[in-house]
């Protein structure tokens, strides 16, 4: 097999992964708090046929060498944590983060996860939970006789009890930040989990230590740009076609060789 067949095959694999990433971005264009991904690639090792700087004669050296590449491989899918637009919902249970930070969520197995999706609900006990039913940490419990809930930009949650005029504070929504957001592991259900690459979670009050502010009655929309993803899809499709053409051309060359 001539090397160009294998090189083109690695190109096909890379563009297929790129298309998978783009498709997932487009599929989540309406997902609250979704952060788009991009595939990152690197070239494979090179075969050095002539080393640059070696002698070409007694008194001269080669100004450049001869190296043949062996293809490409994917190395990562990087999340782009740019801010999504804030969409007004007028629901008192919806909270958008404008800036860096994540809400902290308790999973059924006891582990902690993190989310940008602030479209919260109340469970049967009046506890603030995600759409999947996972409670927010610290716990926020809304009294059954409350008639109004207010969440401040700094995360302080207060309610007005029926028959009273002054609101009372019942809790605080904190934000979690990380040194390396790209190191977080995506779990699905709009959740992320810390890893060694992300660094330890930094618990802070909204608006402090580089975190964003909270906006009640809004949700953060996906940061996917449909037009940009469609352009990326066209480029990926063309790259896939070119690599396929390269395989066909290499095959024709092999056929010619076999006929000699």
UniProtKB/Swiss-Prot annotation:
Protein's name according to its UniProt entry: Flagellar basal-body rod protein FlgG
SUPFAM superfamilies cross-referenced by the UniProt entry: Flagellar hook protein flgE
Alphabetical keyword list: Bacterial flagellum
Organism field: Buchnera aphidicola subsp. Schizaphis graminum (strain Sg)
Coiled-coil positions: none
Gene Ontology BP annotations: bacterial-type flagellum-dependent swarming motility
Lineage: Bacteria, Pseudomonadati, Pseudomonadota, Gammaproteobacteria, Enterobacterales
Signal peptide: none
Superkingdom, natural source: Bacteria
InterPro entries: Flag_bb_rod_N (IPR001444), Flagellar_basal_body_rod_CS (IPR019776), Flagellar_FlgE/F/G (IPR020013), Flg_bb/hook_C_dom (IPR010930), FlgE/F/G-like (IPR037925), FlgG_G_neg (IPR012834), LlgE_F_G-like_D1 (IPR053967)
One Pfam match: Flg_bbr_C
Subunit structure of this chain's protein: The basal body constitutes a major portion of the flagellar organelle and consists of four rings (L,P,S, and M) mounted on a central rod. The rod consists of about 26 subunits of FlgG in the distal portion, and FlgB, FlgC and FlgF are thought to build up the proximal portion of the rod with about 6 subunits each.
Main localization of the protein described in the UniProt heading: other
Family of this protein: Belongs to the flagella basal body rod proteins family.
GO cellular component: bacterial-type flagellum basal body, distal rod
Compartment list: Bacterial flagellum basal body
């Amino acid at each position: 097999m001539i090397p160009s067949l294998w090189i083109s095959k690695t190109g096909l694999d890379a563009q297929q992964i790129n298309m998978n990433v783009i498709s997932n971005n487009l599929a989540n264009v309406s997902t609250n708090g979704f952060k788009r991904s991009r595939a990152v690639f690197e070239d494979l090792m090179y075969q050095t046929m002539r080393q640059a700087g070696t002698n070409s004669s007694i008194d001269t050296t080669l100004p450049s060498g001869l190296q043949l590449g062996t293809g490409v491989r994917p190395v990562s899918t990087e999340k782009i944590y740019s801010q999504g637009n804030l969409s007004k919902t007028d629901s008192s249970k919806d909270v958008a983060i404008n800036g860096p930070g994540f809400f902290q969520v308790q999973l059924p197995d006891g582990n902690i996860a993190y989310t940008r999706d602030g479209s919260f609900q109340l469970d049967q006990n009046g506890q603030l939970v995600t759409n999947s039913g996972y409670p927010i940490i610290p716990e926020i419990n809304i009294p059954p006789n409350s008639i109004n809930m207010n969440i401040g930009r700094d995360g302080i949650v207060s309610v007005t009890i029926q028959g009273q005029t002054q609101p009372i504070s019942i809790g605080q929504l904190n934000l979690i930040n990380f040194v390396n957001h790209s190191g977080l592991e995506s779990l699905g259900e709009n959740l992320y989990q810390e890893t060694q690459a992300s660094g330890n979670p930094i618990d802070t009050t909204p608006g402090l230590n580089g975190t964003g502010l909270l906006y009640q009655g809004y949700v953060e929309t996906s940061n996917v740009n449909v037009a940009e993803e469609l352009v990326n899809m066209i480029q990926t499709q063309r790259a896939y076609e070119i690599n396929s053409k390269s395989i066909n051309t290499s095959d024709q060359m092999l056929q010619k060789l076999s006929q000699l």
